[in-house]
């Protein structure tokens, strides 16, 4: 409830705000773009405007953006200077939230920043996300059960969420008001991950079905890799993966 959130901000006067809410599934965003746009743009907009209007300039606001905003271009290695060219409603929404945050920082002087995060995983990951689905399948598989996946020939920069939280805290508390790309700087294919998990779990590949229609996205990024050198240079953060 936006009204409740804004009321709490005015009442508590927090030192820091971290916006992690919003529909975050790329696949789901194709089927429910309205929810994706509203949840990733509307509330950050309201919070930023509330901070500006009430002159709460001491608040440090962090907006969580995504490397999905970069889309598919010839250059795979993405840094803070690369243009956005998103292929999904999710990527579009995150792009908008990035520019919105940057606008309020540069125009109104708010202490607000974005982290452009690559994929990151943890045990808390929603069961509908692909790596969580693969791991849950391997752990809880029933006899003759088949794992259905979409395109597994994609490459992603997969990181560890607890590490990324450290980077996020550094970004929001840095003296400089800058946005940063956060990732491992390495890529691995989904196909490789599936094969590793199946091998470790001693599951025959005949129980894997790929290119399943319900999991194929209308548009998908083939390869994307983060270039996190700037955050290491400025804030001394680096993934241990």
Model regions: which residues?
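Conserved catalytic/ATP-binding subdomain
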Residues: 3, 125-129, 188
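C-terminal substrate-binding subdomain of Rossmann-fold SDR/epimerase-dehydratase oxidoreductases
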Residues: 131-132, 138-241
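N-terminal Rossmann-like NAD(P)+-binding domain of SDR-like oxidoreductases, especially those catalyzing
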Residues: 1-120
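Short, well-ordered amphipathic alpha-helices
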Residues: 44-52, 102, 133-137, 191-196
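A short beta-to-alpha transition loop/helix N-cap that caps and shapes the active-site region
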Residues: 70-73, 123-125, 189-191, 220
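Conserved active-site region of classical short-chain dehydrogenase/reductase
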Residues: 41-49, 128, 162-165, 169
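The catalytic Tyr-centered alpha-helix of NAD(P)H-dependent dehydrogenases
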Residues: 82, 86-93, 123, 127-131, ...
């Amino acid at each position: 409830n936006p009204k409740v959130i804004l009321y709490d901000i005015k009442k508590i006067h927090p030192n820091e705000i971290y916006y992690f809410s919003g529909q975050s599934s790329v696949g789901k965003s194709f089927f429910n773009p309205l929810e994706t746009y509203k949840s990733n743009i509307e509330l950050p907009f309201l919070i930023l405007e509330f901070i500006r209007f009430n002159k709460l300039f001491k608040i440090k606001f962090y907006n969580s953006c995504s490397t999905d905003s970069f889309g598919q271009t010839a250059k795979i290695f993405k840094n803070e200077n690369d243009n956005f060219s998103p292929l999904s409603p999710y990527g579009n929404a995150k792009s908008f939230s990035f520019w919105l945050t940057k606008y309020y920082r540069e125009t109104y002087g708010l202490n607000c920043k974005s982290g452009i995060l690559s994929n990151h995983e943890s045990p808390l990951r929603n069961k509908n996300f692909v790596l969580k689905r693969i791991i849950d399948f391997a752990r809880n598989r029933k006899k003759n059960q088949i794992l259905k996946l979409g395109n597994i020939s994609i490459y992603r920069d997969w990181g560890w969420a607890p590490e990324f939280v450290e980077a996020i805290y550094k970004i929001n508390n840095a003296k400089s008001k800058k946005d940063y790309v956060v990732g491992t700087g390495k890529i691995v294919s989904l196909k490789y991950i599936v094969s590793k998990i199946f091998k470790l779990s001693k599951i025959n590949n005949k129980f894997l079905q790929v290119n399943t229609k319900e999991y194929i996205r209308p548009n998908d990024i083939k390869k994307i890799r983060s270039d996190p050198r700037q955050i290491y240079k400025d804030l001394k953060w680096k993934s241990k993966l």
